[in-house]
Amino acid sequence: MNKLIDEITKGQLNPDVPSFRPGDTVRVHAKVVEGTRERIQLFEGVVIKRRGAGISETFTVRKISNSVGVERTFPVHTPRIAKLEVIRRGKVRRAKLYYLRNLRGKAARIKEIR
């Protein structure tokens, strides 16, 4: 049964996903349906966590919008993501960057990998 599930989910995986880690700044081009129209909505921020494996893998992106922190969680292999761009690589020593929620301004910056 487990092999059958693996074969089915293997076909669902998106091969166009770039490699990214927590601390990286990414721009997500998400497809949003409003009524009968479908449009692309950009969401750019820092990846604060990545969890799961295979088809159920998700990542959370955090950005500051109008001085309010906004976090959005996306499945990695969803067809609702039109494109995923890595803007800059960040150097962090944690897998989950929840501590960024309590930091403001320049303290919330992440060092860039050169």
From Swiss-Prot:
Keyword set includes Ribonucleoprotein: yes
GO biological process: translation
Gene: rplS
Sequence similarity: Belongs to the bacterial ribosomal protein bL19 family.
Keyword ATP-binding: no
Protein name per the record: Large ribosomal subunit protein bL19
Molecular function via GO: structural constituent of ribosome
InterPro entries on file: Ribosomal_bL19, Ribosomal_bL19_CS, Ribosomal_bL19_sf, Translation_prot_SH3-like_sf
Function, as annotated: This protein is located at the 30S-50S ribosomal subunit interface and may play a role in the structure and function of the aminoacyl-tRNA binding site.
SUPFAM superfamilies in the cross-refs: Translation proteins SH3-like domain (SSF50104)
Family matches, as PANTHER family: LARGE RIBOSOMAL SUBUNIT PROTEIN BL19M, RIBOSOMAL PROTEIN L19
GO cellular component: cytosolic large ribosomal subunit
UniProt entry keywords in alphabetical sequence: Ribonucleoprotein, Ribosomal protein
PROSITE patterns linked to this entry: RIBOSOMAL_L19
Pfam families reported for this sequence: Ribosomal_L19 (PF01245)
